[in-house]
Amino acid sequence: NLVQHVQGGVLDREKLARTIKTAVRMLDNVIDINYYAVPQAKNSNLKHRPVGMGIMGFQDALYEMGIAYGSDEAVDFADESMEVISYYAIQTSSDLALERGAYSTFKGSLWDQGILPIDSLELVAKSRPERMFEVDRTQRLDWDSLRAKVQKDGMRNSNVMAIAPTATISNICGVSQSIEPTFQNLYVKSNLSGEFTVINPYLVRALKERGLWDTVMVNDLKHFEGSVQKIARIPEELKAIFATAFEVEPRWIVDAASRRQKW
């Protein structure tokens, strides 16, 4: 839950690192205590021990920082947050290898060869013309030391990250889904208890702070189905921040994904 790791408008790296260390240990435990319907699945999991830790609440984190999804700042934050997650996930898996042993097929793997996910960019670049591979390769953490540690101590898990849609669990936690922009600021949700209206709490808070939350605004939001783009009273800054999925230029979503995938 990325938004829980934003403090004072910035990413709390120390808290995020602590969360990741706990999460990776938990996921590794699941491999051993899980129920497997077929022996092939059990054998594969115990042999390679892959886990997939992802994120949710990315859009909420941007709301907390006052950043529009369609901006360079959002792309940079996507890069920074995923680097921190990747770094400490790999580090924790390597620590677990010391404690519990490396996964059985570690020898000869890319990890064993000192090839981390960030290093795979170089392999791709060699196979493509330079003009077709323009990817930001900025690094903020000490990857050389981590690379050496992985080669020396091994890895407990063959894979450590996977970004899931989190469609259900994000609703349970009350945050935005996965790494996606908000689908709508206002919508009707249905379950066995009936139908109820859900409105973006960050939008309500921002409007209240500016003295814009009143009956007229409520009716305007209903009329435009949660979109703020055609409501004249709302400042352009808020229109950018609270743009919904189909109002954000696709290139920003692709740029953010491009930055994340290198980790």
Which functions belong to the PLM regions below?
Residues 1-5, 58-67, 179, 229-233:
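Short, compositionally biased low-complexity segments
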Residues 2-22:
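Glycine-rich, acidic/polar active-site loops that bind/position phosphate-bearing ligands
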Residues 4-7, 37, 60, 71, ...:
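Flexible loop/turn segments at secondary-structure boundaries
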Residues 7-13, 40-44, 72-82, 184-194:
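Short beta-alpha connecting loops at secondary-structure transitions
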Residues 19-42, 46, 50, 68-166, ...:
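Internal maturation/activation junctions in enzymes
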Residues 24-34, 136-140, 149-263:
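Catalytic alpha/beta core of large soluble enzyme barrels
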Residues 28, 49-64, 168-171:
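Contiguous, well-ordered alpha-helical segments that form the cores/surfaces of helical PPI scaffolds
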Residues 59-63, 94, 204-208:
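Amphipathic alpha-helical segments within well-ordered protein domains
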